[in-house]
Amino acid sequence: MRYLIAYLFVLSACSDGIKTLPSSTGILSEVIFVVEDMLWENQVKDVAFRTFGVPILGLTQDESSFRVIQVNHSEFKSILKTHKNIVIISKNVPTSNQQNKWANGQLVVQLEFKDDDNELIKDLNKVKAIFEFREIKILRNSISKSSQKTQEKLIKEQFNIETLIPSEYTIIKDTVALFWATYNPEKQEEIKHLFVFSFEPKAINLQQEVLQKTDSIFAKYLLGAKHGQHVKIEDMFSPVYSENTYRGLWKLNGGFMGGPFLIKTYFIDKKVVVTVGLIFAPNNRKRKYIKTFEAIL
């Protein structure tokens, strides 16, 4: 009995030492910078906004990649320590990163400050890329829990790509040539479309051909209420291309609707597979929609 009591005491002591971390707070599009006020104002602030605060390409209004929040070390306590995204910048500390440091679902990056703008820009761009990749991964994992698995399997068979179809979308067309799904609730001023199609490239300028093919899909399937109205790529703002991704704006020809779109392309068996996400949400900021398209397409 004496040994049993001693064993239970040791077991209890071990259990008491285990800390259960709280869930992380804040949103994925925010980053808290923990930097002393003088260092922030004189040397870090401008670089932080030139990296994390840069506007998302392909939108009519400025929406930053991340919302930047700064606090000094003495203010960094309580709920701020449980935020999802934290960057700590100090002098004479080793650079490191740690997941779930003070909360589950958290990433904390610590940077050693170097009195060199170019080095700081390089470091913060690397950190930003990590947070962007992490955000897309988290969004994709979250959406995949309730996405339309049967439909995704068919798209995989037809086009040989892995895309996600969120549960709220209604399938309009599903053939070997074209997949089309839409989200258009009656009581919300919000419309989303997803397209997947492929073609054999023939033009010398592939980027132009991708946009022309996409424009023809818009003109054929996305029609307005009046005769002759259809969606088209906005000519006044040239789409931005980078790493198989196109970001641009669409408008309703002969109407007043418009918004952003995102295209991703893949080279599969001598064909170009095109995935498109398009959003109309005049009353909302567009960042969350674009990030979701990045995650699912």
State the predicted function of each range:
Residues 17-105, 115, 119:
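Start-of-domain marker
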Residues 12-13:
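C-terminal motif of bacterial Sec signal peptides marking the signal peptidase cleavage site
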Residues 90-146:
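Surface-exposed, polar helix/loop patches in the mature regions of secreted/periplasmic/lumenal proteins
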Residues 118-138, 163, 169, 274-297:
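Surface-exposed amphipathic alpha-helical segments
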Residues 17-19, 25, 32-38, 166-221, ...:
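Secretory pathway targeting signatures of secreted, lumenal, and periplasmic proteins
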Residues 1-7:
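Sec-dependent signal peptide recognition
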Residues 19, 69-113, 219-274, 284-287:
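Signature of long, low-cysteine stretches enriched in small and polar/charged residues
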Residues 26, 41, 144-173:
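N-terminal "mature-domain start" segment
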